[in-house]
Structure formats: structure tokens, C-alpha cells
């Protein structure tokens, strides 16, 4: 029952060529620090007292809305603690510098090609909010577990997998009693893909993923900053990304923006979204490489923003595996670097992590696009931020770009 699993180190450590430095660095430091201690510490009276403290009702309740991955990304203090450099710094260096593209080193640490060997029943799942880590692995595993005797999926809403993960204990008990003790627990009743749509009520079911009732609608990235199925006047918009070491004390008021946003008009009715998402980006860049980081957002009537999902791409790794790709779900091999043709229009097919959400009437859908998300002002799901590509450029986005959203009609 690998809930919130990870199966491919490349997908965990980098996002289509962009190192997930906000997570992988403190994570490896934390593992290095904790692995250096024996059971003398972990079974000590001090740790027993801490466990007892966490089980007190008032403190325990606070963990109902905790997210372990976000906590790790925020623990900057870990970077100052001592840890054994072998193998943890070796692994960090391999991810950050030695293997920028998917190669044999990464493939040796990829379990996805082995999943079709699994024949036992498997129950997988995740919460929709775990966009930069566990969520994409869940769907990759679903595609590969083709020989499992019984494959079942649960896609949960916010805090559906609260740390320390108590929300699925009853479900797990029913699952294991069914298969290990032969008891009829009802866990197998109904369709095998079960999900919630955040902001909507109740559980839903499907016999397939993607959900067949959802169809892709193409939204143009209009020159006026709106997001609409009608492109309107053809044109473009430009934003600027600056690399490091420029010795500039502050931005200038004449600078182009560091990001672009496109927003739909207020929705006249609830809009349910579920499935794979793709940005078909047409852009020109004066540098040989850049990055595109996009965040899909829910904007309410008061202007409050909820980050829904995100997509990432190092432009030089844009090559699409057409045979493996589907409409709305491009597959990027990330094995071959191809420099951007300077100043020319290039079409990028960028996968955005599949997701689900009800955008309520009166709300708007917004797409935020930038190149560097290291700034605290830049939206980042779970605070997973990325190492910069390092180039400075003016990136021009054409209105012929399209955002493909899977809408339940």
C-alpha cells in the first residue's frame, strides 16, 4: 500500500531539468544528520518523552493540517548541522552538478520500469496538494502497474495525508484484512479509482484514469493578460529574468516584469477540473537556455490566491517523446540538450502536474509564469523552489500559446 510513493529519483530531485533545491538539499542533509545516530538516541528517554508529548490531544491535533514535505523545505536550520559527507554530499553533488540530464545514473535509480513485474494487489494514492513530489509519481505508477492482481487508487483532498499519516489507518486495515485474512471488508466494492475534487463535496469514482468525462478546453494566453478560449488580437508579452552576479543594487522602474500572469474573467458557474494539464507555450528567447515555471491558481472574489498545481521545464530539455505523449499529457525524455535558437519562436509542450479542483462561481483561473522561483514573492507549491538556470534574458510569450485544461462538462 505505497501511499504518496516515490519511484523515480529523477522526478524527485529535478523537475524536467530544474533541480528541486528547496526540497532535495534539506532532505539529504536531514537524512545525513539522522543516519549518523544509533538506536541509543532514537530509543532514548528523551525521544520517548517527545513522542508522548506529540500524542497529547492539543498538540496531536495540530498535525491534522501539517505537511511533512513543506516542513522539510522550510527547515533551513538543518543546513547548518553536521552530517557525514559520505554518501549524502556525494548524492547531492551527483544530482546538482554531475548529472544535469537523465542518463544511466538516473535510470539505475528508477523503479518505474520494474513495476510491471508486480502481480500482487496494490493500493496507491496521494493528496492533490503534493504537486512537486508525490503526486506525479502516483500517476506514473498507475500507468506502469499493468500486471497487478487488483490496482486501487485513492486521491484525497487537502490534509488527506496529514503527517504522521493517520487518515488512512482504517482504510489500510480493511485492505490488509481483505487480502491477508480473507475477510470481506467491502474495500473492493465499486470502481477502483476513487477521488475527491477539492472545494466540491463527497467522493467520486471512475473506472479509468484520466476520467473519461473530462475534455480539454484550450485557453489562449491573450495579449491583454486575460485567459480565454478566444485569442482576440494577436500579439505578445515580455518578461525579464536576471541571472546572478550582476552587481545591481535594485530593480529599475523601467524594467519589464519578472513574471507574467493571465486571468480568466470571473466564472459565471462552478467549473470542475480533473486530469492532465498542458501548456503549449510559443515563446522567443535571446539566450541559449532559460526556464519556464508555471503555477495554476484559483483567485477568489477578495483576491486571495490558492496555488493549485504547477509545471516546470528547462528549455534546453524541451524534446518531446511523441510516441509516449497524449493530448494534454506530453512526455519529456530530458535526455538530450538542445540550445534555444536565438530570438526565434519555439513551441514548447510543457506538462503541468495533473490535478483536480472546483473553481467556484465568482472565482477566476490564473496562470502565473516566470523563470526563477527563488524569490519569496514567487509562488511555489510546498515551498519547493528550484536552482536557477543562470542566464539573463527577455522572454517573449506569444498569444498563440494555449493552456489545455481538463474540464468536466
Regions found by a protein language model. Give the residues of each.
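Accessory cap/linker subdomain of secreted extracellular hydrolases
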Residues: 1-117
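Glycine/threonine-rich phosphate-binding loop and adjacent beta-strand/alpha-helix elements that clamp
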Residues: 144, 168-170, 180-409
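Short beta-strand/loop motif that positions the catalytic acidic residue
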Residues: 118, 124-126
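Residues that line or immediately flank small-molecule/substrate-binding pockets and catalytic motifs
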Residues: 4, 156, 223
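Catalytic histidine neighborhood in serine/cysteine hydrolases
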Residues: 145-159
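Acidic beta-to-alpha connecting loop that harbors the catalytic carboxylate
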Residues: 128-130, 156-158, 372
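Conserved alpha/beta-hydrolase "acid-adjacent" motif
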Residues: 131-137
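Structural recognition of the beta-strand scaffold that forms the well-ordered cores
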Residues: 1-2, 123, 150-154
Amino acid at each position: 500500500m505505497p501511499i504518496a510513493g516515490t519511484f523515480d529519483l529523477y522526478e524527485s530531485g529535478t523537475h524536467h531539468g530544474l533541480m528541486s533545491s528547496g526540497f532535495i538539499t534539506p532532505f539529504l542533509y536531514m537524512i545525513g544528520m539522522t543516519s549518523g545516530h544509533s538506536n541509543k538516541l532514537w530509543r532514548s528517554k528523551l525521544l520517548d518523552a517527545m513522542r508522548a508529548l506529540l500524542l497529547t490531544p492539543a498538540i496531536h491535533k495540530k498535525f491534522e493540517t501539517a505537511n511533512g514535505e513543506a516542513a522539510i523545505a522550510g527547515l533551513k536550520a538543518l543546513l547548518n548541522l553536521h552530517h557525514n559527507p559520505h554518501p549524502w554530499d556525494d548524492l547531492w553533488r551527483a544530482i546538482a552538478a554531475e548529472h544535469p540530464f537523465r542518463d544511466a545514473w538516473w535510470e539505475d535509480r528508477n523503479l518505474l520500469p520494474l513495476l510491471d513485474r508486480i502481480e500482487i494487489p496494490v493500493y496507491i494514492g496521494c493528496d492533490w496538494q503534493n504537486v512537486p513530489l508525490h503526486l506525479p509519481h502516483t500517476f506514473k505508477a498507475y500507468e506502469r502497474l499493468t500486471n497487478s492482481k487488483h490496482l486501487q487508487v485513492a486521491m484525497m483532498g487537502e490534509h488527506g495525508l496529514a503527517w504522521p499519516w493517520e487518515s488512512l489507518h482504517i482504510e489500510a486495515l480493511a485492505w490488509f484484512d481483505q487480502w491477508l485474512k480473507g475477510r470481506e471488508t467491502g474495500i473492493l466494492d465499486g470502481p477502483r479509482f476513487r477521488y475527491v475534487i477539492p472545494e466540491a463535496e463527497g467522493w467520486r469514482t471512475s473506472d479509468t484514469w484520466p476520467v473519461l468525462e473530462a475534455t480539454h478546453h484550450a485557453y489562449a494566453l491573450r495579449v491583454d493578460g486575460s485567459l480565454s478560449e478566444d485569442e482576440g488580437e494577436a500579439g505578445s508579452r515580455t518578461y525579464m529574468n536576471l541571472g546572478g552576479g550582476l552587481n545591481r543594487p535594485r530593480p529599475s522602474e523601467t524594467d519589464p516584469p519578472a513574471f507574467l500572469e493571465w486571468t480568466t474573467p470571473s466564472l459565471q458557474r462552478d467549473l470542475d477540473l480533473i486530469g492532465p494539464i498542458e501548456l503549449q507555450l510559443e515563446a522567443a528567447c535571446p539566450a541559449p537556455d532559460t526556464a519556464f515555471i508555471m503555477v495554476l491558481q484559483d483567485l477568489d472574489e477578495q483576491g486571495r490566491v490558492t496555488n493549485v498545481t504547477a509545471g516546470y521545464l528547462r528549455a534546453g530539455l524541451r524534446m518531446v517523446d511523441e510516441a509516449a505523449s497524449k493530448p494534454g499529457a506530453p512526455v519529456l525524455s530530458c535526455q538530450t540538450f538542445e540550445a534555444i535558437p536565438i530570438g526565434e519562436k519555439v513551441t514548447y509542450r510543457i506538462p503541468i502536474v495533473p490535478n483536480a479542483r472546483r473553481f467556484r462561481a465568482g472565482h477566476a483561473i490564473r496562470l502565473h509564469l516566470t523563470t526563477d522561483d527563488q524569490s519569496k514573492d514567487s509562488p511555489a507549491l510546498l515551498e519547493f523552489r528550484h536552482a536557477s538556470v543562470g542566464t539573463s534574458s527577455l522572454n517573449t510569450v506569444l498569444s498563440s500559446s494555449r493552456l489545455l485544461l481538463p474540464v468536466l462538462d
